[in-house]
Amino acid sequence: MRRLETALQRYAWGKSGSDSMVAQLKKSEDSDFDVDEGQTYAELWMGTHPNGPSRVMRDGHEGTDELQGLYGSAEGPGMFLIELLETHPHYLGDQEHVGDLPFMFKVLSINKALSIQAHPDKKLAERLYATRPDLYKDDNHKPEMAVALSDFEGLCGFRPFREIGKYSTM
Protein backbone atom coordinates (compact mmCIF):
# COMPACT_ATOMS: atom_id res chain seq x y z
CA MET A 1 0.00 0.00 0.00
CA ARG A 2 1.27 3.47 -0.87
CA ARG A 3 0.26 6.89 0.41
CA LEU A 4 -1.16 9.28 -2.19
CA GLU A 5 -0.78 13.02 -2.33
CA THR A 6 -4.19 14.30 -3.38
CA ALA A 7 -5.24 17.41 -5.32
CA LEU A 8 -7.52 20.15 -3.99
CA GLN A 9 -10.13 21.89 -6.11
CA ARG A 10 -11.53 25.18 -4.88
CA TYR A 11 -14.94 26.19 -6.18
CA ALA A 12 -17.39 28.81 -4.89
CA TRP A 13 -19.85 26.10 -3.80
CA GLY A 14 -17.35 24.45 -1.43
CA LYS A 15 -17.32 24.82 2.34
CA SER A 16 -15.00 27.37 3.91
CA GLY A 17 -11.89 26.71 5.94
CA SER A 18 -11.96 24.10 8.68
CA ASP A 19 -15.69 23.49 8.13
CA SER A 20 -14.75 21.70 4.92
CA MET A 21 -14.16 17.96 5.16
CA VAL A 22 -11.94 18.35 2.09
CA ALA A 23 -9.65 20.75 3.98
CA GLN A 24 -9.67 18.46 7.03
CA LEU A 25 -8.69 15.43 4.94
CA LYS A 26 -5.96 17.36 3.11
CA LYS A 27 -4.55 18.51 6.46
CA SER A 28 -4.54 14.92 7.75
CA GLU A 29 -2.60 13.86 4.63
CA ASP A 30 -0.17 16.80 4.63
CA SER A 31 0.83 18.32 7.96
CA ASP A 32 2.40 21.29 6.11
CA PHE A 33 -0.94 22.20 4.55
CA ASP A 34 -2.34 25.39 6.08
CA VAL A 35 -6.13 25.70 6.05
CA ASP A 36 -7.16 29.21 5.02
CA GLU A 37 -10.40 29.99 6.87
CA GLY A 38 -11.42 32.45 4.14
CA GLN A 39 -10.93 29.95 1.31
CA THR A 40 -13.45 27.44 -0.01
CA TYR A 41 -12.43 23.79 -0.39
CA ALA A 42 -14.81 21.90 -2.66
CA GLU A 43 -13.18 18.69 -3.94
CA LEU A 44 -10.31 16.38 -3.07
CA TRP A 45 -9.22 14.33 -6.07
CA MET A 46 -7.44 10.98 -6.11
CA GLY A 47 -6.61 9.86 -9.62
CA THR A 48 -4.79 10.54 -12.86
CA HIS A 49 -6.70 13.56 -14.20
CA PRO A 50 -4.23 16.13 -15.62
CA ASN A 51 -5.92 18.99 -13.73
CA GLY A 52 -5.22 17.33 -10.39
CA PRO A 53 -2.98 14.28 -10.64
CA SER A 54 -2.17 12.29 -7.52
CA ARG A 55 1.38 11.42 -6.56
CA VAL A 56 2.52 8.13 -5.07
CA MET A 57 4.60 9.25 -2.12
CA ARG A 58 7.97 7.96 -1.02
CA ASP A 59 7.79 6.04 2.22
CA GLY A 60 11.41 5.05 2.79
CA HIS A 61 10.85 1.46 1.67
CA GLU A 62 11.22 1.90 -2.10
CA GLY A 63 14.10 -0.59 -2.25
CA THR A 64 12.11 -3.44 -0.74
CA ASP A 65 9.66 -4.28 -3.53
CA GLU A 66 9.00 -4.04 -7.26
CA LEU A 67 8.86 -0.24 -7.04
CA GLN A 68 12.60 -0.21 -6.43
CA GLY A 69 14.18 2.27 -8.82
CA LEU A 70 10.92 3.77 -10.06
CA TYR A 71 11.50 7.02 -8.25
CA GLY A 72 14.94 7.37 -9.84
CA SER A 73 17.79 9.07 -8.09
CA ALA A 74 16.12 12.48 -7.96
CA GLU A 75 14.91 13.68 -4.62
CA GLY A 76 11.31 14.74 -4.40
CA PRO A 77 7.92 13.85 -3.03
CA GLY A 78 7.24 10.90 -5.29
CA MET A 79 6.00 10.00 -8.73
CA PHE A 80 2.70 10.70 -10.42
CA LEU A 81 0.17 7.89 -10.14
CA ILE A 82 -0.20 7.80 -13.93
CA GLU A 83 3.56 7.12 -14.25
CA LEU A 84 3.24 4.21 -11.86
CA LEU A 85 0.30 2.77 -13.80
CA GLU A 86 2.09 3.20 -17.13
CA THR A 87 5.10 1.25 -15.85
CA HIS A 88 3.03 -1.32 -13.93
CA PRO A 89 -0.22 -1.79 -15.91
CA HIS A 90 -0.89 -5.10 -14.13
CA TYR A 91 -1.88 -3.03 -11.07
CA LEU A 92 -5.15 -2.42 -12.93
CA GLY A 93 -5.72 -6.10 -13.65
CA ASP A 94 -6.79 -7.13 -17.13
CA GLN A 95 -8.66 -3.89 -17.84
CA GLU A 96 -8.31 -1.99 -21.12
CA HIS A 97 -7.41 1.24 -19.31
CA VAL A 98 -3.64 0.70 -19.42
CA GLY A 99 -1.81 3.71 -18.02
CA ASP A 100 -4.89 5.43 -16.71
CA LEU A 101 -7.73 4.90 -14.29
CA PRO A 102 -11.27 4.37 -15.60
CA PHE A 103 -12.61 6.51 -12.75
CA MET A 104 -11.86 9.54 -10.60
CA PHE A 105 -12.27 9.25 -6.85
CA LYS A 106 -13.46 12.51 -5.28
CA VAL A 107 -14.49 13.75 -1.87
CA LEU A 108 -16.87 16.71 -2.10
CA SER A 109 -17.53 19.28 0.58
CA ILE A 110 -20.66 21.13 -0.52
CA ASN A 111 -21.96 24.37 0.97
CA LYS A 112 -24.31 25.46 -1.86
CA ALA A 113 -26.53 23.52 -4.24
CA LEU A 114 -24.74 22.30 -7.34
CA SER A 115 -26.04 22.80 -10.85
CA ILE A 116 -27.92 20.02 -12.62
CA GLN A 117 -25.52 17.72 -14.42
CA ALA A 118 -26.09 15.27 -17.26
CA HIS A 119 -23.56 12.51 -17.78
CA PRO A 120 -23.68 10.76 -21.17
CA ASP A 121 -22.66 7.17 -21.77
CA LYS A 122 -19.23 6.49 -23.33
CA LYS A 123 -20.37 6.42 -26.99
CA LEU A 124 -22.33 9.66 -26.68
CA ALA A 125 -19.47 11.31 -24.75
CA GLU A 126 -17.06 10.44 -27.56
CA ARG A 127 -19.44 11.84 -30.19
CA LEU A 128 -20.13 15.05 -28.23
CA TYR A 129 -16.43 15.68 -27.64
CA ALA A 130 -15.60 15.05 -31.32
CA THR A 131 -18.23 17.54 -32.48
CA ARG A 132 -18.07 20.15 -29.67
CA PRO A 133 -14.73 20.07 -27.80
CA ASP A 134 -15.40 23.67 -26.77
CA LEU A 135 -18.34 22.45 -24.65
CA TYR A 136 -17.24 18.90 -23.78
CA LYS A 137 -13.78 18.86 -22.22
CA ASP A 138 -13.07 15.16 -22.80
CA ASP A 139 -14.56 12.02 -24.32
CA ASN A 140 -15.13 10.22 -21.04
CA HIS A 141 -18.43 9.05 -19.69
CA LYS A 142 -18.92 9.96 -16.06
CA PRO A 143 -20.82 7.32 -14.14
CA GLU A 144 -21.09 8.33 -10.52
CA MET A 145 -21.59 6.73 -7.17
CA ALA A 146 -22.16 8.76 -4.01
CA VAL A 147 -21.28 7.69 -0.50
CA ALA A 148 -22.37 10.20 2.12
CA LEU A 149 -19.79 10.93 4.80
CA SER A 150 -22.14 13.41 6.48
CA ASP A 151 -25.78 14.50 6.24
CA PHE A 152 -26.83 15.70 2.79
CA GLU A 153 -29.82 16.10 0.46
CA GLY A 154 -29.66 14.89 -3.10
CA LEU A 155 -32.02 14.71 -6.05
CA CYS A 156 -31.72 11.99 -8.64
CA GLY A 157 -33.63 11.32 -11.84
CA PHE A 158 -36.50 13.10 -13.50
CA ARG A 159 -40.22 12.57 -13.87
CA PRO A 160 -41.26 10.84 -17.09
CA PHE A 161 -42.05 13.30 -19.91
CA ARG A 162 -45.79 12.49 -19.89
CA GLU A 163 -45.99 13.10 -16.16
CA ILE A 164 -44.21 16.45 -16.49
CA GLY A 165 -46.85 17.47 -19.05
CA LYS A 166 -49.60 17.09 -16.43
CA TYR A 167 -48.04 19.93 -14.43
CA SER A 168 -47.35 22.19 -17.40
CA THR A 169 -49.56 25.27 -17.88
CA MET A 170 -48.42 26.02 -21.44
Show which residues each predicted segment covers.
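Transition-metal
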Residues: M1-M170
